[in-house]
Amino acid sequence: MELYTVGKIVNTHGIRGEVKVVATTDFVDQRFADGATLYLVKKDQAPVELTVEHARMHKGLVLVKFKQFNNINEVQHFRDAELKVADQDQAELEEGQYYYHQIIGLTAETVDGRVLGKIKEILAPGANDVWVVDRKQKTDLLLPVIDDVVKEVDLAGGKVIVELLEGLE
């Protein structure tokens, strides 16, 4: 079973077993819905299946309470663990939309065929995502994900075609 990250636990909240989660999904309401199944993944440990009892937004974070845990002592060791969802639980996306894991690792090329590097990370600072391209012997290139820049995404070919606007490089 393939698992995909939807959030990271950064701390506990209160004494009743809630955790603070930085969400890395555009589907917060769906991923953290009451009764949703998530997998807790800590480094070098097998995933643990958890069921969301309830979740709510609080100061830009998602506060999540799992059915399996009822006090702070049971969830303290979850700090820095990732919350993941199974591949079969992923929502269908509209045409032209992609999951982060589909984009990370693709090669970025210009419209004239010049290889820029590999996409290593996706930032979500505001209105649109920003792809971080790892370039050899250069600083990372930040590409805004807008129609003027991203011309084509070729998942089968493992690349994205971009047009570098003035000031991007």
From Swiss-Prot:
Its main location: cytoplasm. Keywords: Chaperone, Cytoplasm, Ribosome biogenesis, rRNA processing. The keyword rRNA processing applies. An accessory protein needed during the final step in the assembly of 30S ribosomal subunit, possibly for assembly of the head region. Essential for efficient processing of 16S rRNA. May be needed both before and after RbfA during the maturation of 16S rRNA. It has affinity for free ribosomal 30S subunits but not for 70S ribosomes. Belongs to the RimM family. Binds ribosomal protein uS19. This is Ribosome maturation factor RimM. The lineage of its organism: Bacteria, Bacillati, Bacillota, Bacilli, Lactobacillales. The gene is rimM.
